[in-house]
Structure formats: C-alpha cells, structure tokens
Regions:
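N-terminal "assembly arms/tails" that initiate or stabilize quaternary assembly
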Residues: 1-76, 307-309
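Extended, compositionally biased alpha-helical segments that mediate assembly or anchoring
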Residues: 239-245, 251, 258-311
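Short, catalytically relevant binding-site loops at active-site mouths
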Residues: 128, 179-183, 225-229, 299
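Alpha-helical scaffold segments that mediate packing/assembly in large oligomeric complexes
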Residues: 93-165, 307-311
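Short helix/loop capping segments that flank catalytic or ligand/cofactor-binding pockets
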Residues: 51-54, 183-186, 296-298
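Structured, hydrophobic secondary-structure cores that serve as assembly/anchoring elements
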Residues: 48, 72-102, 156-186
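Extended, solvent-exposed, turn-rich assembly/linker loops in the middle of proteins
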Residues: 132-204
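A conserved mid-domain beta-alpha-beta active-site/ligand-binding segment of alpha/beta enzyme cores
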Residues: 206-230, 239
Length: 311
C-alpha cells in the first residue's frame, strides 16, 4: 500500500483520539520512547545524583562534588497485539470517492471502538498496577460509594495520601466516572473547597473541555463502562471484539495519577490495502491494520497512583 494512505489513516486516528479520548494525555512526549522492531520498545529514564558537600578550602575547581546525569533505556514489550479488517464496496483506491468512504470508516472505528478500548485498557492497567503495589495499596485503593456527602472529602483525601507518599505536590489528574458528576454538582455550594465546572484545561498538551476543577486538581469525566477493576479482552472471532467488563468487575469511581506517571505507547503497524484487482476474496477493497499498544509505569512512580472503587 502506498505510504500516503498509511499516513492519512494515522492522521484520522490521531485526530479522533485527541477529540474523544480521556487518556490521550498519557501518550509520552517525543523522544521518550523508541521502537526497536516488532512489539519491542525502549523507554528513556533520566536520573541525576543528589547534592554533596561544598569544600570552600579548595581553589582548584574541585570544591563542588561531581554530579552525574544518566539517561538509560529500558526494554519493554507491547502486550496488546490487536488487528482489524474492513471490507469496502467496489472502489478503486484511485477514485476520489474511495478516500471519502475510507476516511469515514477509519474515523468511525477510531471514535467508537478504538478510543473506548484504549481508555478502558489504560485506566484498568493503572488500577491494576496500583492494586498490586504492596507498599501502598492498602491506602491508595479506597473502597467507597461516592455520594453528595462524601465525594469531595473522599477524592481530596485520596489525593493528599498520594501526594504525601509520592512526595510530589503538583501535576495530578483525576479521571472520574461521569455518573458521579451529580454528586459533585450538588456538593459544590456546601464546601470550603474551590470547585468549578466547564473548564478548558490542557494536560500534557491535550486540551479537554468541560473539566471540573477540585481546588487545583483537574477532573476529567469518563463513561463508567471504561472504568472497571476487571476487564475481558475479546478476540473478535465469535464476539464483537473490543474490551468489556470482566467477571465480578467493580466500578472504579475515581482514578488519580500524576500526569507524568503513565506512559501509553501505541503503534499502528502493518497497514495493508488491497484494491478490487488485487483482492481475491471479494469484489471490493480490503483494509487491514495491526495495532500494538500497552501502558507502562516506572516502578518509582507507582506511589503516584490511587483509586476509589465501589464496594
């Protein structure tokens, strides 16, 4: 397939992600991740040494203790290897009508299916990592049913716990189930906390509309179907594909994490397009795409994740 088709399809997907995904801000900045082939990637970690003692008695330039800067690359493998095939009516890829039809298909797929799967996986993965962190899971995973009387105190209390343990005060983001928005609206006038709704907020360069600000914490509302403690990844062979709630799944009411903690990596790979003259299966055009993705959190940043889960 010509490269310009792959570039166009990727652009369609990127635009839909930016417009509809609650987790697009989790994609790391350029240069943080490099692809090394297939499902393998490397993620950069920058570290420095701390302060030492200054020796005023030395005049040869050695009064300052030598510091070091290390930029190390750690290898990871993208665990999610997904794919899809679309069959379009008989259009020659060179016809002007083909690109219009293909764009509609790709955008609809990205907006309805791909965005939901990515959001669901990323939120669940963060919860899974926090729940598996033995050092903090007893205080960072809070069991509570959010109501008008406790919603603000529960989320604010969890944020304070996470801040103290992570030793980072600023830069946090909350993803809150949309069904709990009413609880915050009803509680907004009866609290000393500063709460506002309908804000436009930029998180890691991605702008979100209708964001709730709870003091200095941006809260993005997410459909409850994307916030589950257990998920099932469907194969697409005998079902509708995608990701759904797993057996005995509980609702995640709120997930808090630092904006630099999640590293969501994805790769639209092996895009193939077969026109009517090449396609031997039916009289039309076939578009096939392989999509690789995962989410990673450096071990030292696990303390910056917390969640409120329904009892």
């Amino acid at each position: 397939m010509a490269f310009d088709y792959a570039k166009a399809y990727q652009q369609f997907i990127d635009e839909e992600f930016a417009a509809a995904s609650a987790t697009a801000w989790m994609i790391p900045e350029a240069g943080k991740v490099r692809f090394t082939g297939g499902r393998d990637i490397e993620i950069s970690t920058l570290s420095t040494t701390g302060l030492g003692n200054y020796d005023a008695g030395k005049a040869d330039g050695s009064a300052y203790p030598q510091g070091t800067v290390t930029n190390s690359w750690k290898s990871y493998t993208l665990s999610m290897d997904r794919g899809v095939k679309f069959s379009l009516d008989r259009y020659d890829p060179n016809d002007s009508g083909f690109m219009v039809t293909a764009e509609k298909v790709i955008r609809e797929f990205a907006r309805i299916a791909l965005v939901k799967e990515q959001d669901t996986y990323r939120i669940h993965r963060l919860y899974e990592l926090a729940n598996g962190d033995a050092a903090h899971n007893t205080t960072h995973i809070v069991s509570a049913a959010l109501t008008k009387t406790n919603a603000i105190a529960t989320v604010s209390g969890l944020l304070q716990t996470v801040r103290d343990d992570a030793e980072e005060m600023d830069g946090y983001v909350a993803l809150i189930s949309h069904k709990h928005k009413t609880a915050f609206l009803e509680a907004a006038n009866g609290t000393y906390h500063d709460i506002s709704f309908g804000n436009a907020v930029s998180i890691n360069g991605v702008t979100y509309e209708n964001v709730m600000m709870l003091d200095d914490l941006p809260c993005v509302f997410v459909p409850q179907s994307r916030m589950k403690t257990v998920i099932t990844v469907q194969s697409g062979d005998s079902d509708q594909g995608g990701i759904v709630a797993g057996e005995n799944a509980k609702d995640i009411a709120c997930l808090i994490t630092h904006c630099e903690t999640p590293l969501a990596v994805s790769k639209l790979d092996a895009i193939k397009q077969f026109g009517p003259q090449e396609n031997q299966l039916f009289d039309g055009t076939s578009i096939q795409a392989r999509y690789l993705y995962d989410l990673f959190v450096p071990g030292k940043r696990l303390a910056s994740i917390g969640a409120v889960v329904a009892p």
